[in-house]
């Protein structure tokens, strides 16, 4: 079978080595005679796996003991509600840095629980879009927390500067950013991430939260979204998505074998640089994002002649380059280059783009 490269924004590719290991262990995990999908989440074997997964994640991100790691459900959208219910702490407002679709979605959900402020940071210089630097963010001193999204998958925008605001709780939606590069976890109080981009299959959500902000949830908070309840029950207040947890653990081990986040960050830059170079050196393709804020995870580009979009997608799919259609909000194309996307996949895409430009340009 020809190699298929999945450029979807999520669910995304999972490393081939991880899939092969999961396939090998599917019917008989740890010589138990059962699949991990079939055993109790309270069994000794599963708990050991869960502890290993957390340890590997802590090693990768250098998470100190002052943080809890929670494996939850509900995706990032679940956290859009959980965050205000857990962190407002009787205050009436929070600051939401608005850089695109997902940060705005979090803001809109927060309006159900408080009076949040949307701080719009996008600006256009000529034809290129960029983002205001953090020192120009108009932060409200009375806000309960600051929420931002370092990578907007739909818009192809990234904030690489890490937040430093004194006496403020910093919350980050890292769904498409986590494990793609090294970060200083101590600059944050809570980061959360849906798994289906850089971690594993859809169904599990990871929360990394500073211990001293757990325990201030409002009375209206459902137990399933209460960080203290989840923490006290070791992420097993209800039956967790066991297979997604297991696969995430395999991905963490795979990342460590690749050399950790420094090596992954270097490879991710190489992949995105290759694709952006192709776009920038062409009059056939265009990217409208300032180079300082271009996403390494989600490369958004347009054909100068949009009438060729359908043909581009159809011919790309025939060569094994799948799910390149851009989101309906922005149109065009989007190539998601998450950790599991090999360099060879990007090279194949660039080669196809050159062929397509030569034929139709």
Curated annotation (Swiss-Prot):
<keyword id="KW-0808">Transferase</keyword>
<dbReference type="InterPro" id="IPR015422">
    <property type="entry name" value="PyrdxlP-dep_Trfase_small"/>
</dbReference>
<keyword id="KW-0963">Cytoplasm</keyword>
<comment type="pathway">
    <text>Cofactor biosynthesis; pyridoxine 5'-phosphate biosynthesis; pyridoxine 5'-phosphate from D-erythrose 4-phosphate: step 3/5.</text>
</comment>
<comment type="subunit">
    <text>Homodimer.</text>
</comment>
<feature type="binding site">
    <location>
        <position position="102"/>
    </location>
    <ligand>
        <name>pyridoxal 5'-phosphate</name>
    </ligand>
</feature>
<dbReference type="Pfam" id="PF00266">
    <property type="entry name" value="Aminotran_5"/>
</dbReference>
<keyword id="KW-0032">Aminotransferase</keyword>
<dbReference type="GO" id="GO:0006564">
    <property type="term" value="P:L-serine biosynthetic process"/>
</dbReference>
<feature type="binding site">
    <location>
        <begin position="238"/>
        <end position="239"/>
    </location>
    <ligand>
        <name>pyridoxal 5'-phosphate</name>
    </ligand>
</feature>
<feature type="binding site">
    <location>
        <position position="173"/>
    </location>
    <ligand>
        <name>pyridoxal 5'-phosphate</name>
    </ligand>
</feature>
<keyword id="KW-0718">Serine biosynthesis</keyword>
<feature type="binding site">
    <location>
        <begin position="76"/>
        <end position="77"/>
    </location>
    <ligand>
        <name>pyridoxal 5'-phosphate</name>
    </ligand>
</feature>
<protein>
    <recommendedName>
        <fullName>Phosphoserine aminotransferase</fullName>
        <ecNumber>2.6.1.52</ecNumber>
    </recommendedName>
</protein>
<keyword id="KW-0664">Pyridoxine biosynthesis</keyword>
<feature type="binding site">
    <location>
        <position position="153"/>
    </location>
    <ligand>
        <name>pyridoxal 5'-phosphate</name>
    </ligand>
</feature>
<dbReference type="InterPro" id="IPR000192">
    <property type="entry name" value="Aminotrans_V_dom"/>
</dbReference>
<comment type="similarity">
    <text>Belongs to the class-V pyridoxal-phosphate-dependent aminotransferase family. SerC subfamily.</text>
</comment>
<dbReference type="GO" id="GO:0005737">
    <property type="term" value="C:cytoplasm"/>
</dbReference>
<dbReference type="GO" id="GO:0004648">
    <property type="term" value="F:O-phospho-L-serine:2-oxoglutarate aminotransferase activity"/>
</dbReference>
<keyword id="KW-0663">Pyridoxal phosphate</keyword>
<dbReference type="InterPro" id="IPR020578">
    <property type="entry name" value="Aminotrans_V_PyrdxlP_BS"/>
</dbReference>
<comment type="function">
    <text>Catalyzes the reversible conversion of 3-phosphohydroxypyruvate to phosphoserine and of 3-hydroxy-2-oxo-4-phosphonooxybutanoate to phosphohydroxythreonine.</text>
</comment>
<comment type="pathway">
    <text>Amino-acid biosynthesis; L-serine biosynthesis; L-serine from 3-phospho-D-glycerate: step 2/3.</text>
</comment>
<feature type="binding site">
    <location>
        <position position="42"/>
    </location>
    <ligand>
        <name>L-glutamate</name>
    </ligand>
</feature>
<dbReference type="InterPro" id="IPR022278">
    <property type="entry name" value="Pser_aminoTfrase"/>
</dbReference>
<dbReference type="InterPro" id="IPR015421">
    <property type="entry name" value="PyrdxlP-dep_Trfase_major"/>
</dbReference>
<feature type="binding site">
    <location>
        <position position="196"/>
    </location>
    <ligand>
        <name>pyridoxal 5'-phosphate</name>
    </ligand>
</feature>
<feature type="modified residue" description="N6-(pyridoxal phosphate)lysine">
    <location>
        <position position="197"/>
    </location>
</feature>
<dbReference type="GO" id="GO:0008615">
    <property type="term" value="P:pyridoxine biosynthetic process"/>
</dbReference>
<dbReference type="InterPro" id="IPR015424">
    <property type="entry name" value="PyrdxlP-dep_Trfase"/>
</dbReference>
<dbReference type="GO" id="GO:0030170">
    <property type="term" value="F:pyridoxal phosphate binding"/>
</dbReference>
<keyword id="KW-0028">Amino-acid biosynthesis</keyword>
């Amino acid at each position: 079978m020809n190699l298929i490269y999945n450029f979807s924004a999520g669910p995304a590719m999972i490393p081939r080595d991880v899939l092969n290991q999961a396939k090998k262990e599917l019917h008989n995990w740890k010589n138990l005679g059962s699949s991990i999908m079939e055993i109790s989440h309270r069994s000794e074997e599963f708990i050991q796996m869960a502890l290993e997964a957390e340890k590997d994640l802590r090693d990768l991100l250098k998470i100190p003991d002052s943080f809890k790691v929670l494996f939850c459900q509900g995706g990032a959208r679940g956290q859009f509600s959980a965050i205000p219910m857990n962190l407002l702490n009787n205050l009436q407002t929070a600051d939401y840095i608005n850089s695109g679709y997902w940060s705005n979605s979090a803001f809109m959900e927060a309006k159900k629980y408080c009076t949040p402020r949307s701080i719009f940071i996008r600006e256009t210089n000529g034809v290129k879009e960029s983002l205001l630097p953090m020192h120009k963010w108009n932060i409200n001193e009375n806000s309960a927390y600051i929420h931002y999204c370092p990578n907007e998958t739909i818009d192809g925008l990234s904030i690489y500067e890490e937040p430093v605001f004194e006496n403020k709780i910093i919350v980050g939606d890292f769904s498409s950013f986590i494990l793609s590069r090294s970060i200083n976890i101590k600059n944050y109080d809570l980061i959360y991430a849906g798994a289906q981009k850089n971690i594993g299959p859809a169904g599990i959500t990871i929360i990394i939260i500073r211990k001293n902000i757990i325990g201030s949830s409002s009375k209206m908070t459902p137990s399933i979204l209460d960080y203290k309840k989840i923490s006290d029950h070791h992420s097993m207040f209800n039956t967790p998505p066991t297979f997604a947890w297991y696969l995430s653990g395999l991905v963490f081990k795979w990342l460590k074998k690749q050399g950790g986040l420094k090596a992954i960050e270097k490879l991710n830059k190489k992949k995105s640089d290759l694709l952006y170079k192709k776009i920038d050196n062409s009059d056939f393709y265009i990217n409208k994002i300032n180079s300082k804020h271009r996403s390494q995870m989600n490369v958004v580009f347009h054909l100068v002649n949009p009438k060729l979009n359908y043909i581009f997608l159809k011919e790309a799919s025939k060569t094994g380059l799948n799910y390149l259609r851009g989101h309906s909000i922005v149109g065009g194309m989007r190539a998601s280059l998450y950790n599991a996307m090999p360099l060879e996949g990007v090279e194949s895409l660039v080669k196809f783009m050159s062929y397509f430009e030569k034929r139709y340009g």
